[in-house]
Every structure is written in C-alpha cells, then in structure tokens.
Amino acid sequence: MKQPSALSALVEALRALPGVGPKSAQRMAYHLMQHDREGAERLGRSLLFATEHLRHCDKCNTFTEAQICEVCSDEERDPTLLCVVETPADQIMLEQTMTYRGLYFVLMGRLSPLDGIGPKEIHFDRLVRRASDGIVKEVVLATNFTNEGEATAHYLGQTLKARGLAVTRLARGVPVGGELEYVDAGTIARAMLDRRTM
C-alpha cells in the first residue's frame, strides 16, 4: 500500500531535521496526524512565523527579529571582547554561565571540507571585518572540541592573529562534578596540559 502524498511530504520534511531518520520521521508524522493534530497545526504556524520573522543580526549573525540582536544592542557589554561560536545554541549556553560579558559572532557552522563547508559558508569575511573594526582587542574562539571545531579554531586563530588580534581558546578539562574515573583519557590529558597555577 502506498502512503498518501501529503503524508509522504510530511515524512520527508521531518527527515530534514538533524538526527531524524526515515523511521523516526514516519513515527512523528503518524503521531502528529493520529494523536496531536492541534500540535501539528501549532508546529506549522510556529515554523511559518519563525521563517517569516527571524533574520540574522547584522553585527553578530545570530538569529533575531530585529536588525541588531539584544546582545549586540546591550551597551553594558564589553565591545573589546568578541567570542566566536558555531551556533546560536552555543551562544545561549555561554550566556547561561553568566561569566562572559563581551560580544559574539556566530559562524552558523564549522569548517568541513568533506561536506563542502569552507570559509565562505561560515561567514569568515564578516567575522574578519567585525574583529578588525578597531574596537575588538581579543577574540575568544569557542568552537566545539570536535575535529571540525578544532580545525575551524586553528584556521580562524591563524588568520586573526596575523591581523594583530589577541586570540584565545576556551580551556578544556574535567567537567564540574566529574569524577576522574568516568572521564575519558583524552579529556584528562588535556586538563593536565591546561592546568593553572593556584
């Protein structure tokens, strides 16, 4: 038996989400149509609203409904510090720590040559313009500690240092509350190398 075309289209749309395979997409589609049509309609309206109203901040590239986002508009922020993150979700996580009071630049990705993602796709030129505005003194590279994140940090670091900017990288180490017994050897090794004087 062939699926109705409307259901097939819904399954395909759900498959576009990261981490959602064909079976998961099909389960979600059936659930929404069978048990939660109101939720499906709400989801549809929310997606439409988001696509119509969200844009990229002219300064930091994060999602916003205004031309300039709330963080970039905040005059209490330290404009000499610029933290580079991969995604708006990473920016939110850093904000939740309440330890950083500078500004941001959101790459909306990371370098991944095998996937066709180069400097242009991560808005490298915009980052360089922003970091070279004469106000920024230090760029904090807060890309993830994956192979691609490390490669991105290395590439950005080399290029920004060549422009005379101070470039720092988030430290790596044992998570707060983490017991050494349960932490992987690479993390422990990095924590040992990045140890600080007390």
UniProtKB/Swiss-Prot annotation:
Keywords assigned by UniProt, alphabetized: DNA damage, DNA recombination, DNA repair, Metal-binding, Zinc, Zinc-finger
GO process annotations (BP): DNA recombination; DNA repair
Superkingdom as given in the UniProt entry: Bacteria
Keyword Zinc among record annotations: yes
Domain Toprim: 80-175
Pfam families: RecR_C (PF21175), RecR_HhH (PF21176), RecR_ZnF (PF02132), Toprim_4 (PF13662)
GO molecular function: DNA binding; zinc ion binding
Zinc finger intervals, C4-type: 57-72
InterPro entries given in the database record: DNA_Rcmb_RecR, Rcmb_RecR, Rcmb_RecR_Znf, TOPRIM_dom, TOPRIM_RecR
Keyword Zinc-finger (UniProt): yes
Disulfide linkage: none
HAMAP family named in the record: RecR
Family membership: Belongs to the RecR family.
Function, in words: May play a role in DNA repair. It seems to be involved in an RecBC-independent recombinational process of DNA repair. It may act with RecF and RecO.
Name of the featured protein: Recombination protein RecR
Name of the gene this protein is made from: recR
